[in-house]
């Protein structure tokens, strides 16, 4: 997993409640187990019409949000069935951060495992960020994990917290496999002792 300390990027506002994993990546695209290649299918049914043409009114199809790497969502973001493909699609599309008032627990954990920083903040903060991004497409924020701050050049400043384990994983660029490999010698010693 790529380490995360400070990230500055364009904000895409998608503040809808209960965005579920089937909306994030529809089931017809879940035929592979590789982590890459899912970005083109992110929010597919919202981004494209039945003929496969981009819907111009969808935020991610608008030029001001091209290259966005910070997604702002609504309450209960990532609800529905557990599918790791959802954060894989978010990450593969180019998002490093998702900010929402609440996340579905399993989705939140899948984001950590996939290298997408999921930040919980108040609805008031989400609305303030979204309003700025809607008013000024291309609006950028800086997310500083070490300091626990979200800031904008316009003076916006929001403090946030993530649990210590998640913080460590992101700062050090460790996924579950990386964490396990840090204990490879102890695991080998245990296996020898119990063989």
Swiss-Prot record:
GO terms for cellular component: 3-isopropylmalate dehydratase complex. Catalyzes the isomerization between 2-isopropylmalate and 3-isopropylmalate, via the formation of 2-isopropylmaleate. It catalyses: (2R,3S)-3-isopropylmalate = (2S)-2-isopropylmalate. Pfam families: Aconitase_C. CDD domains: IPMI_Swivel. Pathway: Amino-acid biosynthesis; L-leucine biosynthesis; L-leucine from 3-methyl-2-oxobutanoate: step 2/4. The gene is leuD. Its EC number is 4.2.1.33. Belongs to the LeuD family. LeuD type 1 subfamily. It comes from Koribacter versatilis (strain Ellin345). The lineage of its organism: Bacteria, Pseudomonadati, Acidobacteriota, Terriglobia, Terriglobales. This is 3-isopropylmalate dehydratase small subunit. It is an enzyme of class 4 (lyase). One of its GO terms (molecular function) is 3-isopropylmalate dehydratase activity. Disulfide bonds: none annotated. Heterodimer of LeuC and LeuD. Keywords: Amino-acid biosynthesis, Branched-chain amino acid biosynthesis, Leucine biosynthesis, Lyase. Signal peptide: none annotated. One of its GO terms (biological process) is L-leucine biosynthetic process.
